[in-house]
Amino acid sequence: MFNFRRRKAASFPDEEILNYGLKLAMEFGKNWLQPIQTRLSKKHPELTMEQLDAYNDICQKAMKCGHDCVYSMESGLTDKQMFERLDAQLSVDFGWVSRKNRSKLFSQGMYYRWKDLG
């Protein structure tokens, strides 16, 4: 199994694939909350099924972490403060997540927070 939580760039050649996989995991519409293996294999046919499964697992975990982090924050924080907390949490747990994906995770988390909590 791969260790995708490491932040070191030199030992982390799959950062681009991880971010693409996370982008796929966050797609709304018919692919929402669906596994990413088939879609990921279209862009990266060199990946084995074991690798595709590992990418799916870690990307789904990163997405859930981002959504849960935003959803569970206390009331009264500004959007900027909430994003900074999400950014800090992702830096610890999923340091490979790109700035663009962090922003999208924040937006999705805020949507669910607003939808469920008002």
Q: Model-predicted segments: where are they?
A:
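Charged, amphipathic alpha-helical regulatory modules used
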Residues: 3-118
